[in-house]
Amino acid sequence: MTSATSNGQEPASGGAPAPAHEPQNDTHVTDNTGEPPLKKAKLDEPFTLNGDKPPRRKGVAPIKAEYLVDINAIPVSAPEENTDDAAEAAHHEEREDDKKKKPKIRGQNTNRTFGRYQDEKGLCPSRVFAPEFSPGECRFGDKCRFEHDLRTYLKEHKREDLTTFGGVCPVWDARGKCYAGWKCRFVGSHMTERDTPDGRKELVLVEDEERKKKSPRLVPYASEEGLANTISVDDRNALSRKKIKTPRADAYSSWLDKTSKQLEKTLHGRRQNDGGVVEFTKEEREEQRANYTEPPFLPSEKRRLYFGPETPTLAPLTTQGNLPFRRLCVELGAQFVYSEMAMSMPLIQGTKSEWALLRSHETELTPPTISPSDKIVQGYDNSKDMKFGAQIAANKPWQALKATEVLSKFTPNLRVIDLNCGCPIDLLFREGAGSALLEHHSKLEKILRGMNAVSEEIPISVKIRLGVRDNAPNAQKLVERLVLGGHESHLLGLGPCGTAAITLHGRSRQQRYTKQADWGYIAETAALIKNLNKRKDELTDTIYEPDERMLPNGGKVYFLGNGDCFSHQDYDDHINNAGVDSVMIGRGALIKPWLFEEIQTGQYLDKSASERLSLVEKFAKYGLDTWGSDEYGVGITRRFLLEWLSFHRRYVPVGLLEYLPPNIQDRPPAWRGRNEMETLLASDHYKDWIKITEMFLGPAHKDFKFEPKHKSNAYETEG
């Protein structure tokens, strides 16, 4: 990457990103033009051609004429369907109710399958890490279905070693130890044959002490593998057998149920004002408060939060927001990240796949980089802050409370626990979760109040949309309730529900991604929240002032905007003109993860094809570090790398554009890159994506399959 701007100026001191490395691979990638990488585009200067430029067409990426391709000269593929909802809740997608309907080659693939990727015959777990002649004892003995002879396994049942990354296991290279043992696809790089006293040759695994010393833990509670927020098998089994008690959630849920019934009885038949609110005199309010039972306990004091202009945030992304991708974004400048959305019931039941979503890398648990200012709330301790938060979904208060309690018990190293009230997927909506809660304000307030009560020191946040239906936004009414507390809460003297931060996605559920996000409405909501934060003391009933522990951040509620951020110009505009505390970025980061770098440096980064390929290489390394370097781990890494490439291929280099800033809603006409690799990275064909993964993960397993999210590309994929 070059460090000059388009007019030859150097970036501000300390702001230039570190140069990317070329792929350390036996596959050499070069720009066929032989030219150095293009310059960065300066913030305020659009690219120009000699002479007059054609006007910018709405909805079409403004690609320079010399890079356009005659579509009549190439085969026409099926039109691309909008797949952006897939990043919301891919593995919670709706299922087709009418099985008799004739399938159409369009829309999203639901219930996708990915084939299988494992050894022809597995190695017995008692042998995986043991020297050849000193295996552990197998409890199944002769009845064991796995291979016990190490040399037979290596020769007949395990695929040949990979030659990518110079033939060296990237996990062993980084940590001095490989956690896949003999099953590693690079095992030749960390094994040797030694002579035994009886004259035999014994195969043994090798560890590198020097490499271990160079890989210290970044946080004290991370595991040897650099992971945190993991739950033990015993604890998961105890959850599945209902042996883990949730006394705080149970007590608070009972109180909520009892109080709700009493309140409903009190309000029934009372006359309402024009706003639909039942009015009480001061004496009546005091009488009602005296009749209600106090909550069983008050919330624990929460860690103070901070969101600011220097803290761009990666949105919770199902499937796409996996650990390797989050790790990549953190490295590129994301200051806060979230887990994929986890469903409350599977968490309560100890489901392995759901708890796996909470695993985080130690780089996600380091403090964010912030600029101290008067906007930081009193009591905020940056050294105790971290980048990683969890997001959950629930349709009933007791589910959300139980899930929150077990999360705070088994994964205490969370920045926040966020409640998803924005997911538009039909399956969740029909169950009353996700965006369905946008129409049940009182219920949502109860859920958040209860979560705040049982979460120990972890703050609670919420992500919402404009509303459920187009032309009927109700987010501002909801926000006022979440900041100040609803009418029922004031009647009981409870005050605000304890939400520390609110994120608003500028679209309705009905709208999905068909139109631009409404940043005008987001700006109005930001102004409303600032006003409510200032007036909170005036609006609070001073006689029944809520306990300070119920008020996160000393009473300040942070507000984040979300939707269509695709450049540092978009980000700055939202901060300065919409008035949000920070911006949450979803699709923009999937298409170009270095968007966080652009925000830090304040300029467009025209990444060359080889620089972009180095990010693909990093994802592959991080995937093997996360899921393992054995056959299964390589297959999982390939699958999620393909998922990311299905979004990343939408990127059109800024050096090819007539106008800046780019618009995330624009779709490009047929175009070619500045070299073959840039063209390959932009391909919309799954076979080209697989070709890219094979540069780092080797040939795909014969049984590997990949079904893209969009059915126009839905072919059986065999590597």
Curated annotation (Swiss-Prot):
Keyword Membrane appears in the UniProt entry: no
Q: Does the keyword Methyltransferase apply?
A: no
SUPFAM superfamilies given in the database record? FMN-linked oxidoreductases (SSF51395)
Basic and acidic residues composition-biased segments? 88-100
Annotated region Disordered: the residues are 1-117
Question: Any signal peptide, and if so, which residues?
Answer: none
Query: Which keywords does this Swiss-Prot/TrEMBL entry list?
Result: Cytoplasm, Flavoprotein, FMN, Metal-binding, mRNA processing, NAD, NADP, Nucleus, Oxidoreductase, Repeat, tRNA processing, Zinc, Zinc-finger
Gene3D superfamilies recorded: Aldolase class I, Zinc finger, CCCH-type
Task: Report the top EC class in one word.
Answer: oxidoreductase
List compositional bias (Polar residues) regions by residue number: 1-10
Q: What does this protein do?
A: Catalyzes the synthesis of dihydrouridine, a modified base found in the D-loop of most tRNAs. Specifically modifies U47 in cytoplasmic tRNAs. Catalyzes the synthesis of dihydrouridine in some mRNAs, thereby affecting their translation.
Task: Please state what the protein is called.
Answer: tRNA-dihydrouridine(47) synthase [NAD(P)(+)]
Q: What is the source species?
A: Aspergillus terreus (strain NIH 2624 / FGSC A1156)
Write the lineage as a comma-separated list: Eukaryota, Fungi, Dikarya, Ascomycota, Pezizomycotina
What is the name of the gene encoding this protein? dus3
